[in-house]
Amino acid sequence: MSGTCVIGLQWGDEAKGKLVDLLAPRFDWVVRYQGGANAGHTVVAGDETYKLHHIPSGILHSDVQNVITPGVVINPTTMLQEIDGLQARGIDVFENLKVSERAHLVMPWHMIEDATINATAVRGESIGTTNRGIGPCYRDKVGRTHAIRMIDLIEGSRDERIATVAGQKQVLLKNLGASEEELDSIAPEKMVALAASWAERLAPMIADTTDMVLDAAEANQKMLFEGAQGALLDIDHGTYPFVTSSNSSGVGVCAGAGVPPKWINQVLGVCKAYSTRVGGGPFPSELEDETGEKIRKLGNEFGTTTGRPRRCGWFDAVAVRYTARLSGVTRLALMMMDVLAHFDELKVCVAYELDGKEIHRVPAHAEQLRRCKPIYETIQGWNTPVDDARSVDDFPPLAMAYVKRIEELVGIPVGVLSVGPDRAQTIFTEESKVMGL
């Protein structure tokens, strides 16, 4: 089997969805393996723009089978809204999307819990939650007692199970300070009716995706694994506690999708030509000045899911080298090169200064990373638009010098360059041929 992963190497929002959409026709399957509706993928196809949260970006290609595997947590209401939006635009989602019976459900009580707990944030600073209930759902998944899975929707004991957990959650959330209105919204009878409505529509899509994926792999079919968020948000390896609740780096692919490591052949690490972050947490190369604001405006850096303005900064080679090594990246995709075409001078963070010492690693403790001062290398900008570039030969020499320097600092060749949101604004370099792209 040929398995290729698309992994974000920063704090998410690296334009992974664009690449998955572009690469999908070359594969038989697109597999979404972690995260939930907290992640947003934007795909631009001609005059159409699609904003996807649950559904794999391969859904825009009718001859590609899309699957959502056990590592994903699903809000059925949100997913059905997403499905209805796509169906209204002529995309037959039910025909080529299957959802794992093992996937856990984000229930209405999870969103109440998310907002309530986030009100008492770390150091008064939000950990970056989208209040979509993702963290509490993963917490229940690990705790097991209150977890609801997709298969529970179609089992005979559904109503009893839902009613029992809803009643228990009312008690727990009351103790956390939830309002009477919030508690009433998750009354057992309301949750039972809601689950029944979900089951009626989703039942045809629920399947044993683990068995499907393994059968396809053994039949030597080509698979594209689509990650959500970015590796710096990984629950185990990211900038903890300002992280997500799943393994968003390359280490999460096999567990989330249910495939053995031997079937992952290539890993495409996606990063912007600069850095962005949403929500709280340390960000060594952040620019809290007019340069950062210029990047935000040029890159339209506002969250797909929340609409929140993203924090912007220079490219952090220390962080990207770390996540690229962690994820086993074989080639880089350097996105948003068009944004940097408006600067006379660029900077790249090549090391940190921590308590007077130069370091070349990402500290495990958030407070240590917060104390890190970026050590920059200045690179001459090209200050020439590259939006119309369709090959490496169309790039100004100074732009290619920037690309080469990123390759040197990260230690991995660049296989893809992006100069805009449209599919046509994507350039595959000679290095991409190694991946069979």
Swiss-Prot record:
Localisation per UniProt entry: Cytoplasm
Pfam family, one: Adenylsucc_synt
Positions annotated as active site in the UniProt record: D13 (proton acceptor), H41 (proton donor)
InterPro entries: Adenylosuccin_syn_GTP-bd, Adenylosuccin_syn_Lys_AS, Adenylosuccinate_synth_dom1, Adenylosuccinate_synth_dom2, Adenylosuccinate_synth_dom3, Adenylosuccinate_synthetase, P-loop_NTPase
Residues the entry annotates as binding GTP: 12-18, 40-42, 310, 336-338, 418-420
Gene3D superfamilies: Adenylosuccinate Synthetase, subunit A, domain 1, Adenylosuccinate Synthetase, subunit A, domain 2, Adenylosuccinate Synthetase, subunit A, domain 3
CC per GO annotation: cytoplasm
Record's protein name: Adenylosuccinate synthetase
Annotated organism of origin: Rhodopirellula baltica (strain DSM 10527 / NCIMB 13988 / SH1)
Organismal lineage: Bacteria, Pseudomonadati, Planctomycetota, Planctomycetia, Pirellulales
Record gene name: purA
